[in-house]
């Protein structure tokens, strides 16, 4: 049962804290902290002492709970701790393949080479990891060492779909991943949204020469996330911040943190007031500024400042334009569809149900420029 604050002892607080991390006991939480701290500090001696004293740690998740970072050797592979990896392998660690996959998706190529020399080999579907993290160097390494460009079921479109739909944001890595896919024989559509995905201003210049209305054109979800490249029919599985369906190229640039392309679009006359299309149920009509507020680049730690919002506001973006939006987040505790009717960019951020997605720096700047709820 529940313990009142007046009755609680230190041991009760310790147990509650351990369980909040998904661990059964305070001593197990302490061990997890000691192990992960030692790996981060590259303290092979402490890691060795812990494993000798508690041999089961060699095969349990380093954090003590279920985690894709894995047991200590795999955990070390994520951050390139080669000395610790070699020691743990000698001590009997068996998670060689998982460690190899983690090194590749984190771009730790020296570590991946070490694990390859130990006998790890690219498994079918292993390229999906670097595609998820947009790690072009890890992707190229796997392909150079014989990896199949497919998921575990052999679907050759799955990797490129992952690059386009992943939660990760890393413009340069994404551009290079798509070029690697093209080198693997994937035919990327010659569309303007794909030119943005690829970071190709040269291709956008060609599109603009052929289509004077390009900069104000609204693009459907399917044009942004092509089904023929394996992109999902469930739009919510394309992991963006503010909805992109029906948006302009400027909307797309904001969500993928394509600052250089956005600047080029504005120089070419893109309208910061351009609104996304409104769907049959009345949702849409938002400008690119909304995407600076509920932001996937902010969510993943890439864009913590207000510079994208500043770019748009400096070009005259209206801080009090209104729109109605709806959003379903995925792979979170609450996956329900939420609706936000008649909100400003500031109101969109103020009311959004997951504040981890809301760029507070952008909100402050919008408020300074006269934005209100």
Task: Report the location of each language-model feature.
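Intrinsically disordered, low-complexity eukaryotic regions enriched in glycine, serine
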Residues: 1-49, 53-54, 64, 75, ...
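Ankyrin-repeat boundary/"N-cap" motif
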Residues: 31-37, 60-75, 94-105, 121-133, ...
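Short coil/turn connectors between adjacent alpha-helices in alpha-solenoid helical repeat scaffolds
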Residues: 40, 165-173, 296-308, 354-359
């Amino acid at each position: 049962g529940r313990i009142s604050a007046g009755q609680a002892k230190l041991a009760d607080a310790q147990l509650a804290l351990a369980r909040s991390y998904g661990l059964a006991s305070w001593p197990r939480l302490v061990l997890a902290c000691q192990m992960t701290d030692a790996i981060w500090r590259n303290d092979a001696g402490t890691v060795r002492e812990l494993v000798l004293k508690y041999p089961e740690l060699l095969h349990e998740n380093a954090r003590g709970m279920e985690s894709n970072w894995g047991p200590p050797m795999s955990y070390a592979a994520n951050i390139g701790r080669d000395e610790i990896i070699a020691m743990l392998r000698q001590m009997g660690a068996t998670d060689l393949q998982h460690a190899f996959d983690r090194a590749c998706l984190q771009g730790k190529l020296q570590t991946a080479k070490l694990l390859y020399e130990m006998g790890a080999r690219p498994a079918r579907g292993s390229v999906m990891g670097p595609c998820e993290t947009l790690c072009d160097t890890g992707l190229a390494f796997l392909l150079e060492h014989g990896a199949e460009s497919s998921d575990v079921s052999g679907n050759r479109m799955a990797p490129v779909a992952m690059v386009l739909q992943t939660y990760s944001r890393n413009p340069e890595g994404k551009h290079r991943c798509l070029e690697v896919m093209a080198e693997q024989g994937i035919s990327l559509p010659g569309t303007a949204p794909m030119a943005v995905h690829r970071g190709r201003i040269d291709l956008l210049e060609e599109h603009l020469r052929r289509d004077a209305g390009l900069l104000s054109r609204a693009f459907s979800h399917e044009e942004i996330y092509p089904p023929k490249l394996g992109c999902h029919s469930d739009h919510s599985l394309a992991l963006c911040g503010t909805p992109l369906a029906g948006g302009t190229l400027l909307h797309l640039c904001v969500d993928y943190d394509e600052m250089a392309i956005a600047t080029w679009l504005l120089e070419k006359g893109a309208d910061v007031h351009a609104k996304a299309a409104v769907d049959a149920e009345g949702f849409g009509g938002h400008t690119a500024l909304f995407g600076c507020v509920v932001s996937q680049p902010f969510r993943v730690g890439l864009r913590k400042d207000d510079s994208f919002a500043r770019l748009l506001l400096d070009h005259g973006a209206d801080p009090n334009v209104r729109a109605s939006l709806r959003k379903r987040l995925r792979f979170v505790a609450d996956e329900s569809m939420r609706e936000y009717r008649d909100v400003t960019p500031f109101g969109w951020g103020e009311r959004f149900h997951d504040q981890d997605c809301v760029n507070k720096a952008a909100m402050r700047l919008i408020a300074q420029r006269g934005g209100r709820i």
